[in-house]
From Swiss-Prot:
GO terms for biological process: apoptotic process; autophagy; negative regulation of glycolytic process; regulation of pentose-phosphate shunt. GO terms for cellular component: cytoplasm; cytosol; mitochondrial outer membrane; mitochondrion; nucleus. It catalyses: beta-D-fructose 2,6-bisphosphate + H2O = beta-D-fructose 6-phosphate + phosphate. This is Fructose-2,6-bisphosphatase TIGAR. It is found in: Cytoplasm; Nucleus; Mitochondrion. Signal peptide: none annotated. GO terms for molecular function: fructose-2,6-bisphosphate 2-phosphatase activity. It comes from Xenopus laevis. The keyword Mitochondrion applies. Disulfide bonds: none annotated. CDD domains: HP_PGM_like (cd07067). The gene is tigar. Its EC number is 3.1.3.46. Fructose-bisphosphatase hydrolyzing fructose-2,6-bisphosphate as well as fructose-1,6-bisphosphate. Acts as a negative regulator of glycolysis by lowering intracellular levels of fructose-2,6-bisphosphate in a p53/TP53-dependent manner, resulting in the pentose phosphate pathway (PPP) activation and NADPH production. Contributes to the generation of reduced glutathione to cause a decrease in intracellular reactive oxygen species (ROS) content, correlating with its ability to protect cells from oxidative or metabolic stress-induced cell death. May play a role in mitophagy inhibition.
Length: 275
């Protein structure tokens, strides 16, 4: 068995985000001035969270966000950011570069509706979920393999992450429960993973948790809101337990979804919206 913390962050704002234009994969827009401020704010919020692995989409808006977060981090020195195309935003094909309102018009003309409508040249929701599933399974296998190696090696302890209640304070303070670990105040995890990705992709990842892994939202969270697209640099945090049995599904504990309190001092748009 292996257990790890999973922190997922949406990239900071771009000019296209501000103007409600679809980017997808074909438009590789950098962060705006506000986007860099948001990324730094997320980095400060996560500055005392220890990460063992950092992954990011290979699109520039996500890469810049990941770099800003790690630049602010005080506990994760010399961690290489791994850029992976499986974390890219949903491809919107002919709708890329167009206003979100036009996508809705395209969907209506085709007899569909957002977000299930797939524009010409775009990815279906099933394809996006398949990417999320593939990467999550890879992540679970990676942590399991590293955990197994550490158990067999007395010299492997450096990779183990001792998570104290203070290490999770940024998240626990936003959860109604005093600790997600019950009575224990000192828990050892096998890894602490940071992912930086995109709004529609992240929503489909969480839907994969809900529909395929039977993840349930804590009672204080509204499902309809949490399945909307995260604000820019919205932060979600989970604890994942992976069993050794091939047929056993990972267990997901939710600490927070689409957290954005770190943006309160920079006048950023924190609205949730549907795509």
């Amino acid at each position: 068995m292996a257990r790890f913390a999973l922190t997922i962050v949406r990239h900071g704002e771009t000019r296209y985000n501000k103007e409600k234009l679809l980017q997808g994969q074909g438009i590789d827009e950098p962060l705006s001035e506000m986007g860099f401020k948001q990324a730094d704010a997320a980095g400060r919020f996560l500055s005392n969270v220890r990460f063992t692995h950092v992954f990011s989409s290979d699109l520039i808006r996500a890469k810049q966000t990941a770099c800003a977060i790690m630049r602010n981090n005080q506990l994760s020195e010399d961690i290489k950011i791994m850029y992976d195309p499986r974390l890219r935003e949903r491809k919107y094909g002919d709708a890329e570069g167009r206003p979100l309102s036009e996508l809705k018009v395209m969907a209506k003309k085709a007899g569909g509706q957002c977000p299930s409508y797939t524009p010409p040249g775009g990815e279906t929701l099933e394809q996006v979920r398949a990417c999320a599933k593939d990467f999550f399974e890879y992540l679970c296998q990676l942590v399991m393999a590293e955990s197994s190696v550490k158990e067999k090696s007395e010299l492997g302890a450096s990779g183990m992450v001792g998570i104290m209640s203070t290490d999770l304070a940024p998240f626990v303070n936003h959860n109604k429960e005093p600790t997600i670990f019950g009575e224990s105040r000192d828990v050892t995890l096998d890894a602490s993973v940071l992912l930086v990705s995109h709004g529609a992709y992240m929503r489909n990842w969480i839907k994969y948790f809900v529909e395929d892994l039977q993840f349930t939202f804590p009672p204080e969270l509204k499902k309809s809101r949490e399945l909307s697209v995260s604000p820019n640099t919205g932060i979600s945090h989970f604890i994942v337990t992976v069993g050794s049995g091939a047929t056993r599904k990972p267990e997901i504990q939710c600490v927070c979804i689409n957290l954005h309190g770190h943006l309160s001092d920079i006048d950023a748009d924190t609205s949730h919206y549907q795509v």
